[in-house]
Amino acid sequence: MRRVRGVGNLLVTILVVLIGFKQARKYCESNEAEFCRLTSLSRASPWWNEHIDPYWDSYVSPCVTKIHDYEHKLDEWAAPRIDRAYYQVQDIVETKVVPVTYKWYKTVQFKTQVYYNGHFVPFLGHARILAKQWLASEGFFQRLYLHVQQGLFCLRNWSLWVWNGSLEAFNEIHSWSGHALQEISNKFSVTENQSGEPVTDEDPSDTDESKYYDAEYFEGEQGDYNEDDETVYLTSTIIETVTLSDEKQLDKSTSAANGDDGSSLDVPLRDLVQDEFQAWSNTVEQKASNTLTQFDSEVEELVEAKLSKAQPNITGLLQGISESFQSHYRIINRAILDVDCTMELDPETGEQLYFNKDGTQLRKYVTRPLMREFFSSAHAHVDERLEMVRARLEKFVAAVNKEVEQVRQEHLEVYEEWGDVMVSEWSKRMAYVDVVAAMGAEDMNQQQHDNWKRFLKLKKQVVNTRDLLMQHPAKLERLQKFLNDIQFTLMALQRDAGEYLFILRSQANIAFQTREKLEREREEEERRKLEQERQIQEQKEREQQELAENEARAARERLALEQGQGQEQLEQNSDEAFFSMEDITATPLGADDNTDYENALDDADSQLSESGDSEDNFYDSYEGDEEDASRELERLERESAERETLDRLELGQRQKLQEEQHRDELHHSSQAN
């Protein structure tokens, strides 16, 4: 109906504009006022008078009159169709368009929030920190940034001041133009009333209606510029409309009332009883139909009051849950970034220290078990918080159902009390009528019998209404919609949390694989270096061993050579001594010769003793070289045993890492499935 009234008001506005323009044209035919120069198109342009006025009088004016005559018929014809089409469109929108749109809106909202908080916010925070560090290092740009910030602040304040001043000026111009237009319209209406000319050539009723529409037009114009007086004009319009439309009906009702006063002096008992019984039956039926309506209305008010209190709490709780999720996401993101770290040794304590890309020391080295602990904590937190919300919703629904049952019980008690009173009182009234009818002259037996049958039927109707009220389902569509929205929100939170944690788990796995690959490459490089050093050491040891063997061989050759030379010299000395002994025995010796002989014997003995000593020294040096060589061999064997032990430990660690990685992959694949 509001839309029909809007269409009707539009047509009335067009009609008022056309009639006002026509009146102004007639007024300005013999008037030279300044107002006529603005409103009369025939004076402003002769072309209008020559080409438009004939068609205006022939076609437009009759159409305006017909539109005015058929306006109420248009309302009667268009109102039901417009209402039916409006409610059909409204049902389609509420049942199909709104749920789907709301579902997609919630999905997009939560997805955007999750990815914004999970990806963009950490990146933005990191970029902000880098920008602050860069500004702190660059003094010129820092001063420039401060000057630009102050300039933008001053520009914003100046823009607000200019905007407020412009709004005040616009409001003043708007108010002044409204008052000016009101004064012009008042002058125009006063001039029209003083002119005494008829508005149209129609009957007086049309003239009154035209005046009414003129008043409505100017009241609407004034209401556009001054909203404070809108209620007064609408009230006056309604009063005038009621007066014009209901005058004849009021006269008819007054005459009918006067006629009833004249004829109601002598009412038969039959008619009086029948009227009272009809009134009572109408009351019972109306009460029966209103009871369910009142119950539904009170339940709706109760649910609305409960939701107005619970909805902000649930909304705040969901926001807190989302923020707590984001805190866990930030912890996991920080841990994923800290996977890529470097290790350094503390020069004082020799402890291993780990630093991230920013150069910040890590409190704890991030490992796969620690990352699994973070993910387990996040999953447990999500499940716990969502279960808490569901428990609170169940408690809220139980409280609402309890209060709804209390309202139902109150309505049942009130209706039962009303039914008992009405039935008992009306049964007494009917019994009294039976007594009076038996004493009177009228025959009312059949009528009273019919009334008692109707009374019994109405009594059963009261009882049935009571039973219907007990079983009538409460209209909790508003509560159900709220619960559906919350359930959808919880499902979206749980789904988004699972998806995002799966993404973070994949990122963490990639980060660990990258770090393990770098560690393997680093270990391979260290192993390669150790192998090269070991080969170099073995080559040096081999060279030293060969050198020692060569020296030992040379020493043995030198010893053999010296032994051979000593034996030859000993043989020569023994031969010379033998020959000298023969010479001595063959020739007689004097005192000097005896002395020389003794000296030669002493020299031979000394040479033999020296050769024996040199041989002993040679064997001693050879035995010392053999001991050094054995010690060197023992050292080489010990180093090779240590290298084999280190290789076995390294192989065991590598196998352990491979087994742990295999278990992680199996765990991830099982969770994904």
Curated annotation (Swiss-Prot):
Principal localisation: mitochondrion
UniProt feature, compositional bias: Basic and acidic residues: 630-673
Compositionally biased region (Acidic residues): 593-605, 612-629
GO biological process, one term: sporulation resulting in formation of a cellular spore
Signal peptide start and end residues: 1-24
Region Disordered, annotated ranges: 530-551, 587-673
GO CC entries: mitochondrion; ribonucleoprotein complex
UniProt keywords, alphabetically: Coiled coil, Mitochondrion, Ribonucleoprotein, Signal, Sporulation
Coiled coil segments of this chain: 503-568, 617-647
Subcellular location field: Mitochondrion
Biological role stated in the UniProt entry: Involved in spore wall assembly. May be a component of the mitochondrial RNase MRP (MtMRP), a ribonucleoprotein endoribonuclease involved in the cleaving RNA transcripts to generate primers for DNA replication in mitochondria.
Family membership noted in the UniProt record: Belongs to the SHE10 family.
Subunit structure: Component of the mitochondria-localized RNase mitochondrial RNA-processing (RNase MRP) composed of one single RNA encoded by the NME1 gene and at least 31 proteins. Absent in the nucleus-localized RNase MRP (NuMRP).
Name under which the protein is recorded: Outer spore wall assembly protein SHE10
Source organism (scientific name): Lachancea thermotolerans (strain ATCC 56472 / CBS 6340 / NRRL Y-8284) (Yeast)
